[in-house]
Amino acid sequence: MPLHKSAEKRLRQAARRNERNRARKKELKGLLKNMQKLIDANAAKSEVESAYRAAVQKLDRLGVKRYIHANKASRKKAQLTKMLNSYTPQA
C-alpha cells in the first residue's frame, strides 16, 4: 500500500489509465477479429472493405496516441491490406 497521498493518487490514476488502455485494445482486437470473420464467412467485398477501413482507422488512432507502438500499427495495417488485396469472394 502507498505510504503517501501522492502515491495513492498515482495508484488511482494508473488504475484508470490501465482500464482505458485495456478497453481501447479490446475494441481494436474486436475490429480485427470482425474483419477475419467476414473473410472466413466469404462475405461481400464491400463488407470486408468497410471492416478494413474501420480497423485501419482505429490502428492509426492508437498508433498516433501511443496506445500501441507505431511500428506495430504499421505492421498490422500492412497485414490487413495484404489480406484485403488477396481476398476474392467465392460464388
Swiss-Prot record:
Chain segments annotated as coiled-coil in the UniProt record: none
InterPro entries: Ribosomal_bS20, Ribosomal_bS20_sf
Region (Disordered): 1-24
Bias (Basic and acidic residues): 1-21
An example molecular function term from Gene Ontology annotations: structural constituent of ribosome
Pfam families given in the database record: Ribosomal_S20p
Ubl conjugation listed as a keyword: no
Listed GO biological process terms: translation
GO CC term (a single one): cytosol
Keyword terms, alphabetized: Ribonucleoprotein, Ribosomal protein, RNA-binding, rRNA-binding
Gene3D superfamilies the record matches: Ribosomal protein S20
NCBIfam families linked: S20
Known role: Binds directly to 16S ribosomal RNA.
HAMAP family hit by this protein: Ribosomal_bS20
UniProt similarity note: Belongs to the bacterial ribosomal protein bS20 family.
PANTHER family: 30S RIBOSOMAL PROTEIN S20, SMALL RIBOSOMAL SUBUNIT PROTEIN BS20C
The protein's name: Small ribosomal subunit protein bS20
Record organism: Chlorobaculum parvum (strain DSM 263 / NCIMB 8327)
Gene: rpsT
